């Protein structure tokens, strides 16, 4: 989202605070601190940020650094709807948010969240976009033209008469963006807007955001983990021109031009587990600037691949522990068997002990439906699933929470779990300081860590995980992959879905690809990732790093070693 507007503050936080507040700023946070009940440490500490109309800001920070809390504070959800102690002041358009209702604030600030389905209220797109205007009393004669303008801005005019229930992930997110911007908010908050999308949907949403911002010119605050996918081929230039970095204590570490912030803080951000543009990560690890096109960077990556060693995991997997045979999964809810168009048909697969299998496919190809069927939570209309009873990690972590505290969630169903074992699990997943918190009060990344920790605590021979690294920062992604790897090394079978092909290349032994309502490929991970025809049919797009490594190395062991060395540059969880 390029912009010619200069950043309104410098790298020096103290200088930013000392500067007078211009009357033209649309958003002003001054010395803001947020504390939640039963959580002694502040989630945000003395945060001061000013945002001018049309200015664009990206927020970097590890999981738990307060990014979600910052967005909730800007919208007024904190403290109006979420119980929290708010210090300092938040002004939106010159008005103190503490003195303004969330309803009034919603006229000034719009939010596009991770899951487009969570914000959809009405059955068709036209009604969905008309609703915000009707709520504001807009002349009905003007609404149709406003709908066309909003859909044009997100490049989705063809969706106007579609059912919202039939939209793909990318289409749904573009409609959510249009429904947010149609009311012309002064501030647009983008909370990981591409995190649940496949490559095709992500590209469409990326283009839609840029087009919509150019049309409506709101101030923008972006939180995004999938930095490289979000920017596409533009790299750092595709990010908002101003960056704010939050430390683990919720303090402002840096605030200034994105290029300068990444140049000065890239190494520490990488060590602290933030997802970064690839060129910044490679500079931090190899010491060479310029990205994959520079000889020094390529030489640095080659050196990381030496010596090749072993792949790190044994290849002689154990016995078959779960089998699906000729499975058909129907789509229609309440439709008689055989009358609904199937989500998947003719699916047969085996899972072996000690093997890690990645399940790939675009949005809507049936990955979640297949996992739920294998878990025994959905019954196939045709075919059979036999074998061990699996454990399931849901994409939405809250769907598996049943207790009131983090420690209770891990203990659930494990009466013999000792206190020492519980403490070890809490420590391994960086949850010790949250042991007495409600699972529902955690950040998105913390909820994901808890869902993984709770299911790994059960000794199920088969573990199914729906996007297990969704919403995690780099450090917690690495820790989660390590935990899944250890479970496989102990003989458990792992099947996980993912949109992240770097994660797949790092962890998986085998890949199953879904497209056109069936399995189109099933084979060793690097063999499948080299099948261009399969990737194209499935709508999958290799990240630039993985594409480069597949061309650079004939040895799969060296590819995995490079990926491991890049992960090793990230600091271990504390």
Segments and roles (model prediction):
Residues 141-159, 419-434:
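Conserved ABC ATPase "signature" region
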Residues 75, 375:
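Helix-to-loop junction immediately C-terminal to a conserved catalytic motif
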Residues 223-225, 498-499:
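H-loop/switch region of ABC-family ATPase nucleotide-binding domains
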Residues 180-181, 455-456:
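ABC ATPase C-loop
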Residues 266-323, 535-574:
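ABC ATPase nucleotide-binding domains
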Residues 249-274, 518-542:
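Conserved beta-strand-loop-alpha-helix hinge in the C-terminal portion
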Residues 188-191, 463-466:
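Catalytic Walker B motif of ABC-type/P-loop ATPase nucleotide-binding domains
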Residues 184, 459:
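Conserved catalytic motifs of ABC-family nucleotide-binding domains
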């Amino acid at each position: 989202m390029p912009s010619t507007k200069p950043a309104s503050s410098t790298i020096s936080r103290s200088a930013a605070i000392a500067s007078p507040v211009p009357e033209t700023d649309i958003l002003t946070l001054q010395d803001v601190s947020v504390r939640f009940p039963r959580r002694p440490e502040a989630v945000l500490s003395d945060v001061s940020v000013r945002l001018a109309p049309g200015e664009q800001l990206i927020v970097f920070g590890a999981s738990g650094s307060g990014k979600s809390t910052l967005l909730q504070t800007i919208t007024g959800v904190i403290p109006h709807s979420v119980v929290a102690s708010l210090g300092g002041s938040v002004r939106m358009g010159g008005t103190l948010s503490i003195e303004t209702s969330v309803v009034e604030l919603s006229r000034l600030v719009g939010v596009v969240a991770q899951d487009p389905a969570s914000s959809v209220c009405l059955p068709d797109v036209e009604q969905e976009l008309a609703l915000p205007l009707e709520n504001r009393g807009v002349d009905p004669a003007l609404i149709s033209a406003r709908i066309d303008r909003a859909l044009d801005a997100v490049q989705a005019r063809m969706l106007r008469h579609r059912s919202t229930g039939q939209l793909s992930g990318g289409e749904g997110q573009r409609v959510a963006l249009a429904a947010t911007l149609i009311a012309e908010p002064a501030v647009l908050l983008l909370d990981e807007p591409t995190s649940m999308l496949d490559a095709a949907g992500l590209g469409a949403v990326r283009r839609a955001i840029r087009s919509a911002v150019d049309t409506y010119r709101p101030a923008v605050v972006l939180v995004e983990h999938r930095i490289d996918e979000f920017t596409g081929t533009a790299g750092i230039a595709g990010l908002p021109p101003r960056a704010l970095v939050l430390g683990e204590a919720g303090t402002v570490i840096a605030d200034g031009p994105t290029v300068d912030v990444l140049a000065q803080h890239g190494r520490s951000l990488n060590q602290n587990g933030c997802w970064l543009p690839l060129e910044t990560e490679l500079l931090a690890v190899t010491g060479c600037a310029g990205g994959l096109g520079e000889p020094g960077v390529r030489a640095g990556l080659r050196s990381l691949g030496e010596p090749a060693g072993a792949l790190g995991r044994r290849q002689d997997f154990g016995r078959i522990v779960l089998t699906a045979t000729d499975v058909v999964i129907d789509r229609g809810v309440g439709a008689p068997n055989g009358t609904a168009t199937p989500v998947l048909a003719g699916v047969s697969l085996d899972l072996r002990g000690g093997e890690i299998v990645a399940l790939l496919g675009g949005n809507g190809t049936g990955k979640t439906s297949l996992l739920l069927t294998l878990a025994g939570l959905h019954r196939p209309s045709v075919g059979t699933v036999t074998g061990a009873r699996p454990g399931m990690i849901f994409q939405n972590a809250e769907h598996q929470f049943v207790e009131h505290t983090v420690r209770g969630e891990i203990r659930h169903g494990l009466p013999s779990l000792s206190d020492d074992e519980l403490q070890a699990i809490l420590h391994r997943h960086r949850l010790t300081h949250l042991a007495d918190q409600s699972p529902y009060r955690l950040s998105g990344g913390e909820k994901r860590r808890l869902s993984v920790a709770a299911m790994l605590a059960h000794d199920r021979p088969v573990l199914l995980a729906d996007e297990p690294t969704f919403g995690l920062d780099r450090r917690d992604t690495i820790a989660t992959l390590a935990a899944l790897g250890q479970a496989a090394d102990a003989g458990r079978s792992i099947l996980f879905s993912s949109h992240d092909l770097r994660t797949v290349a790092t962890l998986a032994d085998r890949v199953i690809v879904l497209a056109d309502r069936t399995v189109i490929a099933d084979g060793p991970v690097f063999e499948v990732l080299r099948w261009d025809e399969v990737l194209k049919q499935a709508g999958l797009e290799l990240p630039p790093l993985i594409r480069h490594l597949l061309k650079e190395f004939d040895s799969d062991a060296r590819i995995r070693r490079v990926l491991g060395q890049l992960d090793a540059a990230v600091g271990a969880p504390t």
